[in-house]
Amino acid sequence: MKRTLVLLFTLIVCVSLIGAAEIKLDVQEHTLSNGLRILMIPKAGVPRVVCHIYYKVGSINERPGITGLAHLHEHMMFKGTEIMGVSDFEKHTAIDQKLDAVMNEIFREMFWTADGGDQDKIARLQKEYDELVKSEKQYIIKDALWTLYMKNGGTGLNASTGNESTGYYVTLPSNKVELQMLLESDRMAHAYFREFYSEKDVVMEERRLSENRPGFYFSEQVNAAFYSASPYHWGVIGWMDDLRKVTKSDLVEFNKSYYVPNNAVAIYVGDFDPENIVAMAEKYFGRIPKGPDVEPIRTYEPPQYSEKRMYGTGPAPTSIQMMFHAPYAGQDDSAALSVLASILGSGGGGGGRFRGGGGGGGTGRLYKSLVQEKQLAVSVSASSRAMWYVGAFQFRATPRQDKNVSPEDLEKALWEEIEKVKQDGVTSEEIQKVQNQVEARFIRSLSSTAGLARTLGRAALHRGWRTV
């Protein structure tokens, strides 16, 4: 069995930054009366348009008992609406309501009783459920959304859920953007969560596959220990027990609370006339009523006043992690720590110019010192991640077992490297080199229409697109 050591601390390091290059974006903005923001960047050339919609909702908007719901909801948004994905809405709805009633009974037996319920009753209800599922299938049109998009030249239909936001993406010919407006406004206003229980099984299988990866459980527990109170305490996939017990009514309430126009931003980048985009947005999205004001997260991460240590054993290489609480996105020192991580680790981050940085490249200070010179580690990395409400600075290293190097030996060596930075700082040449790399990488990300839309959308949800 391999042993892993994790240290959880608080870190304050200041690095002066050379002024970053200014990026100018030709963004046109329009806000509908219901609060939906439309951001447009016209780019003449290839007659295609990248269409993204971002909702300001992610795993941080969950609570204990419904963790993983934001990600599950993303899956369910591809199951159709009242008019899409079903051949006979009324007949299907009648069956679907019976399915919900049967599953509610099964849930009561399984989860609301101390002994796991009446097994004979559960078996009978399960048989009834299986028969209803067979009846339901005759009315379901599989992959209706994707099929319709593909028939009209659509590519790249996808979605993603993070801690703080959820995005839905498609690229279409310029003359088919109206189709995206029609379909996405329909999903926003009339999403229908058919096949909920089978899709929940799909998400639970995703989690099982993650659990089979070496080190998954330990990393999950490290994260839970590091973020003790805030909703960053759990991962986007959620806890398995919550996934088992989450109900369709939980999902419906989640949808009503967060999938509203005043909690979203639509991004269009490509060959189009902005006036036409605004007119179509008013026509389709403008008819959706404004939703309730979205409540911000309540629980912020409290200060950590003492060191935490975790030891674990399992089928994974021996390693050490050291994590430090750090400034969150937008705070002055978050950019400095991103640069420091790249100097130490010499790798690439993401999520904006200075939202994340670091890596484990062969040109970083840590690699030169701990791998090449002292030969204490097989690999070593440093990373900085600044999120909306929390930040983390992290070291990871794998000791040289052939030289009997222990995690404690590596811990001591890492502290020595930290002290060097605190005592001697970093050179202007190191800062300039990293800044050049970060700027080049950031500009490359903006050179693609999809990368530009993604950067713009996520920034718009947080501190505004002008902070890009």
PLM region spans:
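Non-catalytic, conformational "gating/processing" segments within enzyme and secreted inhibitor domains
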Residues: 193, 200-201, 215, 219-220, ...
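Catalytic Zn2+-binding segment of zinc metalloproteases
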Residues: 75-85
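Positively charged n-region of N-terminal signal peptides that target proteins for export
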Residues: 1-4
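Bacterial N-terminal signal peptides
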Residues: 7-16
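M16 family metallopeptidases and their MPP-like homologs
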Residues: 41, 46-62, 69-72, 85-186, ...
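His/Glu-based metal-binding/catalytic segments typifying zinc-dependent metallopeptidases
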Residues: 208, 224, 293-365
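Active-site His/Glu-centered metal-binding helix of metallohydrolases
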Residues: 69-77, 340
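Boundary at the C-terminal end of the N-terminal hydrophobic targeting segment
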Residues: 18-21, 25
